């Protein structure tokens, strides 16, 4: 049986795995599904429809799965889907989607630090870190292993590529290329995330390919974006997976990317 503190309020229709622990003064709504090993410390609020995999941990005053803060939202059925082994620290807030039948989605092994926020319809991958007070507005996509540093603010519909880093207090209104670091107000691309790539085990060839992309797209001011991509396609690293991913990201960007 789940371990539920007497002061917690858990709706009888909520689906709670047998080994879940729910601490004092928590509130769990009707349409919530908590998988094995989830732990709710005190004063956690979880509403739904929302589902959580195994091993998720919720710290005091985190508020997860409440309705969208979008003014267009009129109470339609929307969802929050969360994977495994995520940590939601104090005051973190995650909202459900806005569009009928839509879902905010969070993968596995993510860390949401103090007072961060992921808005409606966000699509967040795996091993992502939201640092303290980092904010992602509605419909933001965040790739695997990305890091959002403290107090940064990400505009609606922005895509942040995998292994990218957003600097503290950055204002991000355009897409962030994979493997890069952006910072500033407004955010601009400062460098390749070399240290992050090394920590994740990328090869020296991968680093060289990404550095070449950075030089073509950001350093060589004589090239248009189209010309830079053509040169990359015909370079010695044309078959490199990181290079091909950057090209794909640029070509599919709908907001342009931070320069």
UniProtKB/Swiss-Prot annotation:
Gene3D superfamilies: Hexapeptide repeat proteins (2.160.10.10), Udp N-acetylglucosamine O-acyltransferase, C-terminal domain (1.20.1180.10)
Complex formation: Homotrimer.
Protein's gene: lpxA
Cellular component, GO annotation: cytoplasm; membrane
Subcellular location: Cytoplasm
Main localization of the protein described in the UniProt heading: cytoplasm
HAMAP family linked to this entry: LpxA (MF_00387)
Enzyme Commission numbers on file: 2.3.1.129
Pathway this chain belongs to: Glycolipid biosynthesis; lipid IV(A) biosynthesis; lipid IV(A) from (3R)-3-hydroxytetradecanoyl-[acyl-carrier-protein] and UDP-N-acetyl-alpha-D-glucosamine: step 1/6
Catalytic activity: a (3R)-hydroxyacyl-[ACP] + UDP-N-acetyl-alpha-D-glucosamine = a UDP-3-O-[(3R)-3-hydroxyacyl]-N-acetyl-alpha-D-glucosamine + holo-[ACP]
GO molecular function, one term: acyl-[acyl-carrier-protein]-UDP-N-acetylglucosamine O-acyltransferase activity
Name of the featured protein: Acyl-[acyl-carrier-protein]--UDP-N-acetylglucosamine O-acyltransferase
Swiss-Prot/TrEMBL GO biological process terms: lipid A biosynthetic process
Annotated source species: Akkermansia muciniphila (strain ATCC BAA-835 / DSM 22959 / JCM 33894 / BCRC 81048 / CCUG 64013 / CIP 107961 / Muc)
Alphabetized Pfam families for the sequence: Acetyltransf_11 (PF13720), Hexapep (PF00132)
Record key words, sorted: Acyltransferase, Cytoplasm, Lipid A biosynthesis, Lipid biosynthesis, Lipid metabolism, Repeat, Transferase
Enzyme class per UniProt: transferase
Record function comment: Involved in the biosynthesis of lipid A, a phosphorylated glycolipid that anchors the lipopolysaccharide to the outer membrane of the cell.
Family classification: Belongs to the transferase hexapeptide repeat family. LpxA subfamily.
Segments crossing the lipid bilayer: none
């Amino acid at each position: 049986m789940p371990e539920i503190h007497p002061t917690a309020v858990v709706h009888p229709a909520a689906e709670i795995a047998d080994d879940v622990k729910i601490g004092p003064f928590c509130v769990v709504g009707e349409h919530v599904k908590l998988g094995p090993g989830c732990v709710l410390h005190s004063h956690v609020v979880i509403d739904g429809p929302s589902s959580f995999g195994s091993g998720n941990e919720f710290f005091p005053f985190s508020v997860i799965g409440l309705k969208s803060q979008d003014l267009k939202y009129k109470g339609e059925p929307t969802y929050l889907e969360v994977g495994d082994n995520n940590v939601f620290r104090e005051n973190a807030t995650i909202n459900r989607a806005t569009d009928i039948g839509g879902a905010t989605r969070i993968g596995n092994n993510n860390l949401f630090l103090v007072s961060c926020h992921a808005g409606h319809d966000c699509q967040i991958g795996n091993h992502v870190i939201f640092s303290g007070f980092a904010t992602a507005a509605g419909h933001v996509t965040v790739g695997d292993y990305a890091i959002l540093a403290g107090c940064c603010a990400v505009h609606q519909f922005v895509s942040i590529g995998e292994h990218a880093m957003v600097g503290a207090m950055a204002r991000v209104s355009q897409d962030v290329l994979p493997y890069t670091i952006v910072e500033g107000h407004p955010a601009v691309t400062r460098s390749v995330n070399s240290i992050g790539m090394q920590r994740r085990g990328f090869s020296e060839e991968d680093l060289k390919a990404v550095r070449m992309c950075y030089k073509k797209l950001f350093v060589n001011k004589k090239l248009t974006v189209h010309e830079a991509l053509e040169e990359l396609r015909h370079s010695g690293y044309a078959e490199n997976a990181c290079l091909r991913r950057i090209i794909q990201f640029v070509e599919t960007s709908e907001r342009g990317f931070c320069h």
